């Protein structure tokens, strides 16, 4: 990879394409504050330098907003989506939609819920057969995430799951990092979502930790994990849900 001069271009405010977030999301005061991050990045982009694909050439493709046809499979990448709230400080992510044989798989990437209402609406409108959604970051409740933001993420997560009506919905990543996640997102789970561990026929690790602690086996299991003995069978374990036979 190598540095190159910046390309000329326009950088419209991404929030302009999110009408529901503007209406239902964070207050205008907060948005003005957060928008400064975006404007600061625009100045950096305009001044450069940028990174080229360098010696990788055609092997590296920037996927933002692109569609790829690979045999009978179509892979669609979204335009950049906020990594959380409007103008989120971690930046942007790309969601992916894969279509093959009349079936559709949607991977949300790291939307933290989604927090943004328009993203929940988009997921529902895609109506995938299989949905993998990262879920709200309930473990950040408190000083690292405002209650209003978490409530928004939980609400929009439920909207996405209910609206998509996917045959299989796997809700994981952020959500399963603390033991109270099921109660926080009961609407999404009531609509049929399962965790990644449950897709493998196992309880989530947070549940297993609670069980081991109650049985006085927590230290033993931690030592097994350190020795690489815990769940060593997982690479060869099949899914407990049928994704291929959709």
Whereabouts are the PLM-identified features?
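Core dinuclear metal-dependent hydrolase active-site scaffold
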Residues: 5-118, 205-246
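Active-site environment of divalent metal-dependent phosphoester hydrolases
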Residues: 85, 112-117, 137-142, 175-180
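Structural motif
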Residues: 103-107, 130, 168
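Short amphipathic alpha-helices and their capping/turn segments at secondary-structure boundaries
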Residues: 115-127
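Short, solvent-exposed loop/turn segments at secondary-structure boundaries
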Residues: 120, 143-147
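Proline-aspartate-enriched helix->loop->beta-strand connector
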Residues: 127-137, 166
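Short, acidic/turn-prone active-site loops that include or flank metal/cofactor-
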Residues: 135-138, 198-200
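Binuclear metal-ion centers of metallo-dependent hydrolases, dominated by the metallo-beta-lactamase
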Residues: 149-246
């Amino acid at each position: 990879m190598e540095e190159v001069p910046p390309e000329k271009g326009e950088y419209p405010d991404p929030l302009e394409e999110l009408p529901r977030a503007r209406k239902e999301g964070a207050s205008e005061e907060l948005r003005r504050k957060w928008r400064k991050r975006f404007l600061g990045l625009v100045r950096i982009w305009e001044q450069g330098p940028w990174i080229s694909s360098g010696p990788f050439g055609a092997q590296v493709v920037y996927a933002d907003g692109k569609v790829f046809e690979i045999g009978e499979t179509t892979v669609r990448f979204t335009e950049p989506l906020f990594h959380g709230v409007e103008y989120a400080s971690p930046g942007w992510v790309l969601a992916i939609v894969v279509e093959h044989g009349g079936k559709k798989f949607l991977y949300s990437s790291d939307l933290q819920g989604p927090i943004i209402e328009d993203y929940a609406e988009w997921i529902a409108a895609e109506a995938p057969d299989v949905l993998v959604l990262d879920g709200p970051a309930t473990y950040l409740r408190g000083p690292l995430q405002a209650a209003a933001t978490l409530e928004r993420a939980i609400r929009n997560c439920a909207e996405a799951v209910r609206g998509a009506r996917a045959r299989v919905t796997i809700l994981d990543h952020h959500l399963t990092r603390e033991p109270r996640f099921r109660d926080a997102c009961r609407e999404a789970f009531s609509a049929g979502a399962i965790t990644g561990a449950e897709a493998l026929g196992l309880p989530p690790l947070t549940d297993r930790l609670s069980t081991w602690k109650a049985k006085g086996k927590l230290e033993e299991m931690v030592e097994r994990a350190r020795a690489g003995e815990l769940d060593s069978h997982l690479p060869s374990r099949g899914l407990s849900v049928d994704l291929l036979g959709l």
